[in-house]
């Protein structure tokens, strides 16, 4: 069995990043409106993939399911590092 020592490159476009940001904003606001802790609910969804963590209010559940969880996590990491001076 051959091993692949090359680093794989993963990237998606700026438009997709903005779409994910808008989706997260809508989901966050919907969770707050329902009286849930938005951070806990979003983390629950990202870890489990279970859409039941996200309400149907404002179409939040359908919106978040349009994105792969790894893309959402990538955008969260990018935003965190950018806002904490660690990356461009």
Curated annotation (Swiss-Prot):
This is UPF0297 protein Lreu_0534. InterPro entries: IreB. It comes from Limosilactobacillus reuteri (strain DSM 20016) (Lactobacillus reuteri). It comes from the Bacteria. Belongs to the UPF0297 family. It holds the Pfam family IreB. NCBIfam families: PRK05473.1. PANTHER family: UPF0297 PROTEIN YRZL.
């Amino acid at each position: 069995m051959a091993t692949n020592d090359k680093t794989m490159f993963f990237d998606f476009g700026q438009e997709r990043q903005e779409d994910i940001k808008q989706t997260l904003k809508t989901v966050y606001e919907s969770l707050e409106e329902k009286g849930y802790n938005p951070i806990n609910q979003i983390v629950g969804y990202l870890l489990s993939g279970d859409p039941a963590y996200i309400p149907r209010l404002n179409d939040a559940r359908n919106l978040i399911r349009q994105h792969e969880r790894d893309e959402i996590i990538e955008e969260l990491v990018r935003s965190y590092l950018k806002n904490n001076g660690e990356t461009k």
